[in-house]
Amino acid sequence: LVGSEMCIRDRYQFDHEVWEGFRFWDLVMPLFLFMTGASMPFSLSKYKTASVDYWPVYRRILKRVILLFIFGMIVQGNLLGFDSKHIYFYSNTLQSIAVGYFIAAVIQLHFSFGWQIIITLLLLLAYWIPMTFLGDFTPAGNFAEQVDRWVLGRFRDGVFWNEDGTWSFSSQYNYTWIWSSLTFGVTVMLGAFAGKIMKEGKANRKKVVQILLLIG
């Protein structure tokens, strides 16, 4: 099929949209976040008791978060290149999973299901307000981009170095991470809600499928 008309027509689906639009490839990272959340009701439910000691729980959670961040820096952050000019702190799907997982773990460990829904909606609202009313909707002018540039500075992926030793932000790199972490947490929580439905509906799998299809 390589080189066929169908392949040529559809291959653009296996890359991210430059800015506006949507492609199949844009589903990959959210799907990983969602699957992470779907497993959490099964793994965290045993810790939701009044007498639980949360320190060992958080120690395991933080260990996973740190490992995912390190692996992310190895995969895409150029950590093993040992070149300080090309090391990026927050630039990878693994790191977005780490942050989303941590946010969702805190919510699930300490809040009832009703409050989990409310907090998830509040996270979306907290993301939406500055994105709508601060900055603009251009790649370089949106609020999330400005936060990344301010917090990460030259350790942001997409930075390029000039011959005189100065650095600049690339106009071709439009991915945002710091402020978008709120939505990473939301996506993991959506997976957790789906996982809760599956966990509590094991006796009637047909109904579980119907509910999941109904809510999308």
Please place each PLM-identified region on the residue numbering.
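Short, small-residue-biased leader/transition segments that mark boundaries at the very start
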Residues: 1-8
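Membrane helical hairpin/interfacial module
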Residues: 9-89, 94-97, 101
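Hydrophobic cores of alpha-helical transmembrane segments in multi-pass inner/ER membrane proteins
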Residues: 29-39, 97-109, 183-195
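Lipid-exposed faces of alpha-helical membrane segments in multi-pass integral membrane proteins
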Residues: 34, 70-74, 103, 107, ...
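Membrane-water interface regions at transmembrane-helix termini and the short interhelical loops
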Residues: 45-49, 80-82, 99-116, 126, ...
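Membrane-interface helix-boundary motifs at transmembrane edges
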Residues: 49-58, 110-115, 197-208
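Long hydrophobic alpha-helical segments that form multi-pass transmembrane helix bundles
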Residues: 113-186
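A conserved active-site cap/scaffold subdomain adjacent to cofactor or substrate pockets
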Residues: 173-216
